[in-house]
Structures are given as structure tokens and as C-alpha cells.
Amino acid sequence: MQIDVARVLGLVTRSVRNFEMDGKAASAVTLTRLYETDVDDLWDALTSKERIPRWFLPIEGDLQLGGKYQLKGNAGGTITACTPPRHFAATWEFGGATSWIDVRLAAERDKARLTLEHTAVIEDHWNQFGPGAVGIGWDLALAGLEGYLATGASVDHETAEAWMGSPEGKGFMTESGEFWRAAHVASGVDPASAKERSDRTIAFYRGEMPPDIAHPGTGS
């Protein structure tokens, strides 16, 4: 498995937004990038039960408005909005916590732009790990999507898991985490606090924290 880490991560624009939601402090991480395809094809890759496992994870459920979904070994939830081929939103329920994803597609010249926003209420895990908790995972997913759209070849999940433990894979986690640290600082967070959280998250994704530490993306 070969990924040009610097190139792939450099294609993504990242931001962090802090705000109040239903009287609680919340934060949204946003990733946006272009893909070498059209909106209809990108929409199908993101929403087809047959195609999602080819670049992300096996999925079960009813993939339509109001339907429930479950990603194997990961999040599940309910689809709360769906306007093909431009927009969908869903709850993201994982590790006992609920957050929210919002995905928008737009044509841009001969390409398709994907914008993904993941919103969570700020709780202990956010204060411990920061935006990289979900941001690194989404960087990995968007890289997998690029590879699939470019070649049509499905991700071999065993190979991908082995790659994540390789020096190149660990380098991806580190560089992604540093991008998220910078986005966190740009949102107005104290740089020292942002670095402490990103260092912790990078260590987790690199497999350098005790195994009993909960996944930083759970939010619980």
C-alpha cells in the first residue's frame, strides 16, 4: 500500500469552529477537498451500500432518510437529511456518545468538492484529545476514498491495517495530527493546550498509548 502522505494530506483544507449548541459548548471539525470525478459518482461512492466498503468500512442498514446504519466495528446512527446528490447528514453514535456528521458535495470545474463537518459537544474526551480525535480518522478515510476513485480497486482492509502500523502509516498519523493542531490553534485555542492534546492523539493513533485507553474518537 503506497500513499504519498504529504501530497494527500496537503489536498485537504481543515478548520475547527467552537460554538454553543443547545446551551452546551460544542466544536465542529471540517475537511474539504476536491476529487477527480463528478458529483454524481462521488455521491454514489459515499452513499452506496455496495461501494462504501470498497474505500471505508462494511456497512449495514437502510441508507435513506430516516434509516439507520451501522459501520462494522465503528459508528452507527440515523440518517437525518438526504438531498441527492448534494447533501446528507446523520448522527454518529460511537462508544456511548452521539455526534453529528454533515456532508456536502459541489461541482467545481471538472471536479467534485467534498465538504465534511463533524460536530460534537465538548466533553472530557474532547478536552483530552482535541479535534484530531476524529480528524485523523477522517483524513485516513478521505485518503482511502481518493485511492478507490483513482483506481477502482477496493481497499484491502488487512493490508490497510498493517500499513497503519508501518513507519509510513505512523508518519501519516503524525502529519495529520500536526495539521489538526494548527487548525485548533487557528480556532483560538491556546497553542500549548492544543499541542498537548494533539501529542496525546498522535500517540494513540501511532499505537504508543496503553491499550486500555478509550479510542479518542468516542467522545465518551
Residues covered by each model-derived region:
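Terminal "cap-and-tail" regions of soluble proteins that handle hydrophobic small molecules
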Residues: 1-23, 119-220
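Hydrophobic/aromatic beta-strand elements that line small-molecule binding cavities or substrate pockets
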Residues: 33, 77-79, 100-107
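Hydrophobic pocket/interface hotspot
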Residues: 42-43, 52, 79, 88-90, ...
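Hydrophobic alpha-helical segments that drive targeting, anchoring, or assembly
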Residues: 35, 75-78, 92-94, 117
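Short beta-edge strand/loop motif at the mouth of beta-sheet-based domains
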Residues: 22-24, 28-31, 37-41, 49-87
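Short strand-connecting beta-turns/loops that link adjacent beta-strands
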Residues: 84, 95-97, 108-111
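Short acidic, glycine/tyrosine-flanked loop/strand segments centered on an H-E-D-like triad
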Residues: 107-123
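Active-site-adjacent structural patch at catalytic or cofactor/ligand-binding sites
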Residues: 97-103, 117-119
